[in-house]
Amino acid sequence: MKKYNLNENYEFVGLWSTPTDPEQLIPGVLKYNAETGINLELEGSFSGEEFNIIHGHASGVNITVVDCFSTSWTMNLGIEGMYAPSKIVGNKIIVGTVIESLDELILEHVVLETSDIKPWSKLSGFSKPLYDDINERRKFSLTYKLPDEKIFYSDEEVDIGLNCSLNFPSTFPLSEDLVFRESNSFKITNKVSKGGLFHSAHVDAIRKFISLATRTDVSCRSIKMKLKDHEPYVFILANLIPINLDYKAKKLSDYDMFFTLTEVEERIQELYSKWFIFYCKSPESINLYFYKTKGWQHDFFLTKAQALEEAHRQINPGTNKWGYQSRVEALFNKFCNVMAHTGDAQAFSNIVKDHRDYYSHWFEKKRNKVSNGLILGYLSRDVNLLLEMMLLNVIGFDETEILKIVENCMAYRSYLEIGREHYPSSSERRHLWASTSPIENM
């Protein structure tokens, strides 16, 4: 079967039916669009408005559309031959098989291919070219050995391994276009034959874990599934909400990432395990960090400020009676080795609270206490940094390790002016939060 990518568009033309009435076959076209979603346009209509499963044989493949609902209203006048087209929206498409229900679906394993994460994983089968003549470099030897699977995570229900694959050009060597594509993928094995799409939470948790580590937007290229007692792979198409960090690295380099796999390989299972537990416990705060805001500066600030509160509440269950300012000040003091570069803890927490109160409820009495422009930009990014350090702490890094991580990240080293204390005081510096200095709009 051909490969189906989540970031491409597809159309499947054929006949469609429901499990409750398999004899009613309606012609139509199923459209998958990476941006707009899944739409089934039928030359007729099924009875009902919601459908757990819709079957199709289209464009030469068997297809199952999952979690569907009709967006059309059709008046059934009982007139034979009446033309009554309808449109149905779906949540997921399984390409390659027909199933009666998700509960009956037993997957042996799932293979998740992400966007390029090799600079993070350092997992490759290529060796560096060896030149016969180092001066002329006219002849070289290049060797390749498929690397062994790296254990990423394991528990009672699943095993997750990180693998490497090489797409070898079929035209080699009789072509000018010699494109070797090596990619990393995660194999998620269903150890207990759990029914349904058991892998969904891990797919999302993995891409967010690596996005945090790399400070970049990691996406899913494809998801293929091996069904029990079903030889070929099948593919799933779904519109995953894209990760879009407000503050991200310019490129995938060791100096722009928080950490690489090689730096934490001995403890990667522990780190991901803690991350997955928190992912399941506090999805709201995680989503506020990873998903795109509207683009206004106060939106950048407010989403991170709200995530900060929710994450702190989940991590510290005994603090339900704490006020917002107390949470921010406690986090500032917890990571004071880093946050000291931004100013005073009490001043910072007070300013964050005033801005949170105003932008979340538009309190008129707080209008004269809020900022915009450059000052709000500093405040938004400082809150974002505090949230990132809290997430790094959640997955297992202590305060000393986090200080080193931030200091080794060139973007934050420059932003926080770490090491710049030896520069002349007359040089332009970043804004520092201080209770003695009133905030001015800039």
Regions flagged by a language model, labelled:
Residues 135, 153, 179-181, 228-230, ...:
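A generic structural signal for short, non-catalytic loop/turn and secondary-structure boundary residues
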Residues 60-70, 163, 175, 215, ...:
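Glycine-centered secondary-structure boundary/capping sites
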Residues 4, 32-35, 115-128, 216-233, ...:
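Short, charged N-terminal helix-start/capping segments
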Residues 197-215, 309, 313, 381, ...:
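A broad, structural surface signal
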Residues 18-21, 34, 234-442:
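Amphipathic, oligomerization/interface secondary-structure segments
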